């Protein structure tokens, strides 16, 4: 029992000790942490930071009082402003109650209407400015389209030239490869020729040596043959020799003559003595040895001389061959030089021929250019004589002191429309005294009567659909110089044929003022113009309001005119009104609308787009500008017709404001 208690007590003590040790360890850790914080807080940097923070806190506390005072002042101002606002609200309320008088209401309505008119005028000016900019944008789009087409042509030409350059480079590469292979084959052939020549030279030298050896052997054999022949001849008995031999034998027998051996010995002794005197050597063996050496040396020299002679002969042959080769080379060079000179002469002739052709083409170009300039000048003169409207052309092309080549079609189309108008007016003036006004209007519009009172020749405007030659001109882009020149030349030929036909038929010519105006037919695209333009006796009514506005165009005097006629569109009812005055040959009528006029010059799409986007707005500013331009271009020979209303009173109908 005691043991159990002791164990329990010891266990409890141990647990308590462990807890105390754990608490001591935690306290020590906390102490170390606090000590670290104390050390950090007691550092110089912390003290400086604390001082800085204390100073900032003092400044903020001082500024807090000032800000509080300012806030109170602003609150006082807000309260004062609120009070003033309440006072003004009460004042406005009282004034609104007192503003029920009729005069004040009328005055305010007048001010509002004046403001509306000012805004409408501003809107009209902005609309006109916008229309002008649309026309300019259309011209710029056309010019951009032309530039795009030119760019496409340039790219096609550049692609073709690049393809040709690529083909030429491939051809040059093939030629260089073939020339390199030919040069390699030539070098190989030249090397083989050198080797064959060396072999031939060696074989020739060897054959020469063998020939010399054979010749030497042949000469030796010939000498041997002669020697043997001589020996054979000596062996044959000769009578004189026999006689001499007998005589010598007799002398020998008598003792009067020595034998041949003795004579030979004596002769040898004499010869040795002479040789000893000549050479200074008395020993016969030495003499024989020297003689053999001398013979060997002579034979060696003979061989050397023969070899030198053969080599000289070989060199002479080589020199002769080289001279022949040089002569042949000089001849080939002379022949090649002659061929090159002939080629140079032929090339020079070709160059001279091309230069002459280029000069002829340049002269022809200058002549054609002069003809084109003359045609442009005549077109300008015809444009001025016809008193065509130049305001639209100035708006489209800008103010220019010269006429470009691509502008000829525009000028001709304007002249054509002007001539159609003049022809219509002339036809109407011719028939106005011979038929009633309704019949005259029908005849002017190209309609035939059931029972015509007088047979008249119908005046047909130029056919703008197709040319007699079958050429069709597209208005997608302007004509080039060559196309324009061909069309003008064809039109001139047609004009000459028409003039000759007129001279043969003796028909009267159309005159405008005093000079004669020849009508040049220029093909246009898409539509044929009717006998009378759509502007004759037409009524230009507003789409939105239902009221019509009147535009007047004045022409000069005509030689064939019988009396004045004024045609204009009436009011909203649409009945035509004709007036006659005492002035001769002066007629005014409503011109073609701006949309149709722009459509005939290639800007129909732009004008239609502008009308469609306006949502029922029909702008007549361009028509008024056309009427002003036509009336001003008539000069001193015509006077403008009186307007139907004052120009200052710009209404909503004329502006097309809906």
Swiss-Prot record:
Q: Where is the composition biased (Low complexity)?
A: 506-519, 574-583, 592-604, 621-639
Using the UniProt record, give the first listed, main subcellular location: cytoplasm
Residue ranges of coiled coil = 11-156, 186-234, 303-380
Q: Is Metal-binding tagged as a keyword?
A: no
Q: Phosphoserine: which positions carry it? A: 500, 506-507, 509
One BP annotation, GO: cilium movement
Keywords from the named record: Cell projection, Cilium, Coiled coil, Cytoplasm, Cytoskeleton, Phosphoprotein
**Where in or outside the cell?**
Cytoplasm, Cytoskeleton, Cilium axoneme
Q: Which domain of life is it from?
A: Eukaryota
Q: Sorted alphabetically, which Pfam families does this protein's record hold?
A: ODAD1_CC (PF21773)
**Record InterPro entries:** ODA-DC/CCD, ODAD1_CC
According to the record, the residues making up region (Disordered) are 496-552, 574-658
Q: Does the keyword Cytoplasm apply?
A: yes
Q: Which residues cross the membrane?
A: none
Please provide one cellular component term from the Gene Ontology annotations of this protein: outer dynein arm
Quote the tissue specificity entry: Expressed in motile ciliated tissues.
Q: How does it assemble?
A: Component of the outer dynein arm-docking complex along with ODAD2, ODAD3, ODAD4 and CLXN. Interacts with ODAD3. Interacts with ODAD4; this interaction may facilitate the recruitment and/or attachment of outer dynein arm docking complex proteins including ODAD1, ODAD3, and ODAD4 to ciliary axonemes. Interacts with DNAH9. Interacts with MNS1. Interacts with PIERCE1 and PIERCE2; the interactions link the outer dynein arms docking complex (ODA-DC) to the internal microtubule inner proteins (MIP) in cilium axoneme.
Q: Which family does it belong to?
A: Belongs to the ODA1/DCC2 family.
Function per UniProt: Component of the outer dynein arm-docking complex that mediates outer dynein arms (ODA) binding onto the doublet microtubule. Involved in mediating assembly of both ODAs and their axonemal docking complex onto ciliary microtubules.
Q: In its UniProt entry, what is this protein called?
A: Outer dynein arm-docking complex subunit 1
Q: Which organism is it from?
A: Mus musculus
């Amino acid at each position: 029992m005691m043991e159990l208690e002791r164990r329990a007590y010891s266990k409890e003590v141990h647990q308590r000790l462990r807890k105390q040790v754990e608490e001591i360890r935690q306290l020590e850790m906390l102490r170390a942490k606090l000590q670290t914080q104390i050390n950090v807080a007691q550092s110089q940097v912390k003290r400086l930071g604390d001082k800085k923070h204390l100073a900032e806190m003092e400044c903020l506390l001082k500024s807090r009082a000032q800000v509080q005072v300012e806030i109170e002042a602003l609150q006082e101002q807000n309260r004062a402003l609120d009070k003033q606002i309440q006072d003004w609200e009460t004042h406005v309320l009282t004034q609104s109650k007192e503003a029920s008088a009729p005069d004040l209401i009328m005055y305010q309505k007048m001010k509002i209407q004046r403001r509306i008119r000012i805004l409408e005028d501003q809107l009209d000016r902005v609309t006109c400015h916008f229309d002008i900019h649309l026309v300019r944008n259309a011209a710029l789009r056309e010019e951009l389209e032309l530039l795009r087409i030119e760019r496409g042509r340039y790219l096609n030409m550049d692609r073709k030239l690049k393809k040709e350059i690529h083909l030429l480079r491939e051809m040059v590469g093939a030629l260089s490869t073939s020339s390199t292979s030919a040069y390699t084959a030539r070098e190989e052939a030249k090397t083989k020729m050198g080797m064959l020549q060396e072999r031939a030279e060696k074989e020739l030298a060897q054959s020469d040596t063998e020939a010399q050896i054979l010749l030497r052997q042949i000469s030796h054999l010939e000498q041997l043959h002669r020697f043997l022949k001589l020996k054979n001849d000596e062996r044959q008995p000769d009578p004189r020799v026999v006689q001499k031999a007998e005589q010598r034998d007799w002398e020998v027998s008598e003792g009067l003559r020595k034998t041949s051996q003795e004579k030979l010995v004596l002769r040898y002794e004499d010869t040795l003595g002479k040789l000893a005197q000549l050479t200074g050597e008395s020993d016969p063996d030495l003499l024989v040895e020297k003689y053999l050496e001398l013979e060997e040396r002579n034979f060696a020299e003979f061989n050397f001389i023969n070899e030198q002679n053969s080599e000289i002969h070989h060199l002479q042959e080589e020199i002769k061959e080289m001279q022949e080769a040089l002569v042949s080379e000089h001849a080939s060079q002379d022949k090649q030089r002659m061929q090159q000179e002939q080629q140079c002469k032929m090339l020079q002739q070709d160059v001279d021929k091309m230069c002459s052709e280029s000069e002829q083409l340049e002269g022809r170009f200058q002549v054609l250019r002069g003809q084109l300039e003359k045609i442009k000048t005549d077109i300008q003169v015809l444009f001025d004589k016809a008193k065509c409207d130049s305001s639209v052309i100035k708006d489209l092309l800008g103010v220019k002191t010269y006429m470009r080549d691509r502008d000829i079609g525009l000028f001709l189309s304007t002249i054509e429309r002007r001539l159609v108008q003049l022809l219509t007016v002339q036809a109407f003036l011719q028939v106005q005294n011979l038929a009633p006004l309704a019949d005259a209007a029908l005849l002017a519009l190209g309609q035939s009567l059931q029972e015509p009172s007088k047979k008249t020749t119908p005046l047909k405007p130029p056919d703008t659909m197709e040319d007699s030659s079958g050429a069709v001109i597209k208005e997608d882009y302007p004509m080039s110089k060559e196309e324009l020149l061909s069309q003008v030349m064809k039109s001139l030929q047609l004009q000459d044929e028409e003039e000759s036909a007129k001279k043969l038929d003796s028909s009267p010519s159309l005159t405008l003022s005093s000079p004669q105006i020849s009508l040049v037919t220029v093909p246009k695209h898409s539509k044929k113009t009717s006998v009378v333009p759509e502007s004759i006796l037409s009524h230009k009514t507003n789409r939105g309001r239902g009221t019509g506005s009147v535009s007047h165009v004045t022409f000069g005097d005509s030689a064939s005119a019988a009396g004045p006629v004024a045609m204009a569109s009436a009011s909203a009812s649409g009945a035509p009104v004709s007036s006659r005055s005492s002035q001769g040959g002066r007629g005014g009528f409503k011109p073609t609308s701006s949309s149709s006029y722009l459509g005939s010059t290639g800007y129909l799409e732009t004008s239609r787009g502008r009308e469609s986007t306006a949502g029922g707005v029909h702008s007549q500013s361009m028509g008024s500008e056309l009427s002003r331009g036509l009336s001003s271009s008539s000069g001193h020979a015509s006077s403008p017709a009186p307007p139907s209303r004052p120009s200052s009173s710009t209404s909503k109908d004329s502006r097309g404001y809906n």
